[in-house]
Swiss-Prot record:
One of its GO terms (cellular component) is apoplast. Belongs to the plant rapid alkalinization factor (RALF) family. Disulfide bonds join 47-55, 67-73. This is Protein RALF-like 8.
Amino acid sequence: MGMSKSIKVILSLALVVFLALAGTKVEASVRYITYPAIDRGDHAVHCDKAHPNTCKKKQANPYRRGCGVLEGCHRETGPKPT
């Protein structure tokens, strides 16, 4: 015996409402980084006024030159140098 069309519609709408409410609960619990947290994090880990040398910032990703022709991994269309 099948369900009537009106019961299927009501159950479908109830499911949509439930999923919409469940989605807003998850979205509301997401935490964001605030400006004070960003300001506090802009120093060295062991930064101390008594030891100012520990407060120097270091470059995150120092520049490294890519692979050259002599290493054999450079895209060169001509013959390899000997």
